[in-house]
């Protein structure tokens, strides 16, 4: 639906931006010169169209989600590899573009700063924004910095919405789902509100 959960401050629905359309995907890949080889995998200039994605170990069902992505992308001629390893390995490998090209991740916070902490080049830098210690998208960093700098809540909300639009327009992210949260409380607990 968007870069942040629908319950997060500043959320904006990215309606129509993420449509499942395998036929259009095939057309776009054809236009870019990625043609199916004998095994159905697309190639261009002798290079196979394949990527490696991390397993988000702390997230339930990450492996199953990636398996489903592998299945769906294989149908259009794209190979997805799952990066093996524990959480420390996944985090280290995710900072190396040669090991992981697509990052499966999420952060469970609902404040305005979560969007900055996720994608700013000096925070988590989930986009690998500048793999050689440079900032690949200075405009994005500037937009994210504004979220943390603005004093008025309405201004911060507007900036968070602009960042979501930008992340979508640049195709930097692909929201898959909003992870459900389950709370268990004992009968003697009163007044609990998630």
Feature map (PLM): residue ranges:
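Detector for C-terminal structural segments
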Residues: 1-25, 61-70, 90-194
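Surface-exposed patches in mature extracellular/periplasmic domains of secreted proteins
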Residues: 1-2, 37-42, 81-84, 159
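Immediate post-signal peptide segment of exported/extracytoplasmic ligand-binding proteins
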Residues: 22-52
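Short, well-ordered beta-strand elements
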Residues: 48-57, 80-83
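Early extracytoplasmic/lumenal segment of secretory-pathway proteins
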Residues: 79-92
């Amino acid at each position: 639906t968007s870069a942040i959960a629908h319950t997060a401050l500043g959320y904006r629905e990215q309606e129509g931006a993420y449509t499942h359309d395998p036929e259009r995907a095939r057309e776009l890949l054809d236009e870019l010169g990625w043609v199916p080889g004998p095994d159905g995998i697309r190639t261009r200039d002798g290079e196979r169209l394949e990527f490696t994605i991390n397993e988000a170990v702390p997230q339930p069902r990450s492996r199953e989600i990636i398996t489903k992505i592998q299945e769906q992308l294989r149908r259009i001629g794209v190979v997805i590899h799952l990066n093996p390893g524990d959480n420390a390995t996944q985090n280290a490998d995710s900072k190396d573009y040669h090991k992981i090209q697509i990052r499966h991740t999420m952060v469970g916070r609902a404040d305005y700063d979560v969007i900055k902490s996720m994608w700013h080049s000096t925070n988590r830098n989930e986009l690998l924004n500048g793999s050689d210690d440079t900032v690949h998208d200075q405009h994005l960093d500037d937009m994210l910095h504004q979220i943390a700098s603005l004093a008025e809540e309405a201004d911060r909300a507007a900036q968070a919405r602009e960042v979501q639009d930008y992340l979508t327009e640049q195709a930097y992210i692909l929201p898959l789902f909003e992870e459900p949260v389950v709370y268990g409380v004992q009968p003697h607990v009163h007044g609990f509100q998630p």
